[in-house]
Amino acid sequence: MELNDFCIATIITALIILCETLSLLLHPGLELSRKRTNTIGSLGLKPHAWKPALWDLNTIDNMELKHLLGDLCMNPRHTRWIAPLLILGDAVLCALIIWRVPYTEIDWTTYMQQVSLYLSGERDYTLIKGSTGPLVYPAAHVYIYSILYYLTDEGRDILLAQILFAIPYLATLAVVMSCYRQAGAPPFLLLPLVLSKRLHSIFVLRLFNDGFAALAMWIAIFLFQKKKWTAGVVVWSTGVAIKMTLLLLAPAIAVVLVLSLSLQPSIQLGALAVLIQILLGIPFLSHNTAGYIARSFELTRQFMFKWTVNWRFVGEELFLSRKFSLALLALHIALLGLFATRVWLKPSGSKLPSFVQQLLQRRYRTVSLSRTFIMRTMLSSLAIGLLCARSLHYQFFAYLAWATPFLLWQTGFHPIVVYAVCMAQEWAWNIYPSTNGSSLVVILSLAVQVIGILWNANGRQIPENSPKEHVQ
C-alpha cells in the first residue's frame, strides 16, 4: 500500500527527524556517500573539504525520502522502537494534563463514600450507596477503590489519585501496543493511540473504573495471543468483576477457546470464569445473594436519555421504548451469528452446523489461531456489542478508542480512511452534551468497523512462522 504524502502529513515532525537520523546511522550509507563524493569531484572540489550536514534533507532524493517514510509507517519492524518513544511522550503529556487541567468531579466522591461503607463492615450490596446513587459495579471494583481509599487519604488527595490513575493508563497503553506488535500491525496505527483527549480525560481527570477494566481487557487479549488460555480467562473474568462491559467479549472468547482447545476444555475454562466471579463476590453473596447479583450485574437497568452518547438522534420516546431495546438485542444476536458463520469459524474450515456436529461427536480437530485472528475476533465482538448497546456513556470510550485503529486496518481500508474515521470518532466522543449529529457519527463509526470486518472476512493475517521481528 502506497502512503506517499500521507505519511508526511500524519507523522509528527520530531518523529520523522528522529527516524531519519536513526536510519542514516544504522543503515549502510556508503553508496550515498560515493554518489555525493563523485558529484563534488565533478565540480572540481576536494572530497575531504565537503562536510555534509546531518539534517540536510536536500541531499536525499525525494523518492528515497518517500521510501524511508513509507517504510517507517508500514514496516512492523519499527514498532519495536517507535512504541516506547510514544509511551514516553504520552507520559509527559499525562503529567502536563494533571498539572494544568482541572480535575472533574463526577463519581470519585461517590466511589469513596461507597467504599467507606464497605470498609465499615457493610456487606449488603443494596445498602451501599453514595451521593449520586447505589453501588452498581461488581466486587473487584470495590476492592480496587478500597486500596485507592487508603492511598489517597480517604479520597481527599485528588492529585495523588490522578497520578495513580496515570499508571494504569500508561500500563494499558503499553499492553495495547504490545498486542498491536504481536498482530503485526504497521506503525502508522500507533499514533492515534496516544492522541485521544477523551481517553486522557477518562483516566486522569475523571478517575473512572473503566480504566482498570480496560487494562484487564487488554492484558487478557495479550495472554490469549500468547496462547495462555487459563491466565487469559482469569484476567478477563477479573475484569468482568470490575465492570460487566467486558462480557461483550464473551462470545469471541468462547469461539477462540473452542477452536483452539475443543469443547470440553473450553467448558472447564468457562466454569473457571464463573468460579472467579463467585470467589470475588463471596463477602457479599453470603449476606444477600440476590441483592448482589441484581445490583452488580443488572441487565435490565433503565438508562437516562440525557447521558447517552450513541442513540440521541432517534429521539427520547423511541430510545426509552421496549421495542427499541428488543430490536437492538435482536440485532446483536444476528450480528454475532453472522460473524460466527462468516468470519470467526473460518479457521475450522467448516460451516456452523457441521462445526457444532463435530464438536458434539468429539470429531473436531483443533486449529492453531494466529495472533492477528485472536485480536480481531475479540475486538470485533466488542465493537458489535457497543454498536448494539442502547446507551453508551463517555467512559465507554476507554474500551473502544484503542480498538478502532486495529479494526479499521483489518477492514482493508486505506490509511487515510483509517485516520479519517478515527478523527471523526474522537470528535463525536468529545462533544458534550452529545447532539443528534455527534451521536450519529458515533453509530456510523462503529458501523464502519463492524461492517468492514464482516466484508473483509479474511482480514490481514500475519503468518505465525514469519521471520519478521514482531512475531518472534
Swiss-Prot record:
- Annotated family: Belongs to the glycosyltransferase ALG3 family.
The residue spans the entry assigns to the Lumenal side of the membrane are as follows: 1-5, 102-131, 179-201, 260-264, 345-371, 417-436
Query: In this UniProt entry, which residues form the Cytoplasmic topological domain(s)?
Result: 27-80, 153-157, 223-238, 286-323, 390-395, 458-472
Question: What PANTHER family has UniProt attached to this entry?
Answer: DOL-P-MAN:MAN(5)GLCNAC(2)-PP-DOL ALPHA-1,3-MANNOSYLTRANSFERASE, NOT56 - RELATED
- Cellular component annotations (GO), alphabetically ordered: endoplasmic reticulum membrane
Q: What is its main location?
A: endoplasmic reticulum
Q: Which gene encodes it?
A: alg3
**Organism of origin:** Aspergillus clavatus (strain ATCC 1007 / CBS 513.65 / DSM 816 / NCTC 3887 / NRRL 1 / QM 1276 / 107)
Q: What is its EC number?
A: 2.4.1.258
Function of the molecule: Dol-P-Man:Man(5)GlcNAc(2)-PP-Dol alpha-1,3-mannosyltransferase that operates in the biosynthetic pathway of dolichol-linked oligosaccharides, the glycan precursors employed in protein asparagine (N)-glycosylation. The assembly of dolichol-linked oligosaccharides begins on the cytosolic side of the endoplasmic reticulum membrane and finishes in its lumen. The sequential addition of sugars to dolichol pyrophosphate produces dolichol-linked oligosaccharides containing fourteen sugars, including two GlcNAcs, nine mannoses and three glucoses.
Q: What is this protein called?
A: Dol-P-Man:Man(5)GlcNAc(2)-PP-Dol alpha-1,3-mannosyltransferase
Transmembrane region positions?
6-26, 81-101, 132-152, 158-178, 202-222, 239-259, 265-285, 324-344, 372-389, 396-416, 437-457
The processes (GO biological process) annotated in the record are: dolichol-linked oligosaccharide biosynthetic process
Question: InterPro entries in the record, alphabetically?
Answer: Glycosyltransferase_ALG3
Per the record, membrane topology reads: Multi-pass membrane protein
Coiled-coil intervals: none
- Top-level division of the source organism's lineage: Eukaryota
Q: Which UniProt keywords apply?
A: Endoplasmic reticulum, Glycosyltransferase, Membrane, Transferase, Transmembrane, Transmembrane helix
Gene Ontology molecular function terms on file: dol-P-Man:Man(5)GlcNAc(2)-PP-Dol alpha-1,3-mannosyltransferase activity
Which compartments does it reside in?
Endoplasmic reticulum membrane
The biological pathway it contributes to is: Protein modification; protein glycosylation
What reaction does this catalyse? an alpha-D-Man-(1->2)-alpha-D-Man-(1->2)-alpha-D-Man-(1->3)-[alpha-D-Man-(1->6)]-beta-D-Man-(1->4)-beta-D-GlcNAc-(1->4)-alpha-D-GlcNAc-diphospho-di-trans,poly-cis-dolichol + a di-trans,poly-cis-dolichyl beta-D-mannosyl phosphate = an alpha-D-Man-(1->2)-alpha-D-Man-(1->2)-alpha-D-Man-(1->3)-[alpha-D-Man-(1->3)-alpha-D-Man-(1->6)]-beta-D-Man-(1->4)-beta-D-GlcNAc-(1->4)-alpha-D-GlcNAc-diphospho-di-trans,poly-cis-dolichol + a di-trans,poly-cis-dolichyl phosphate + H(+)
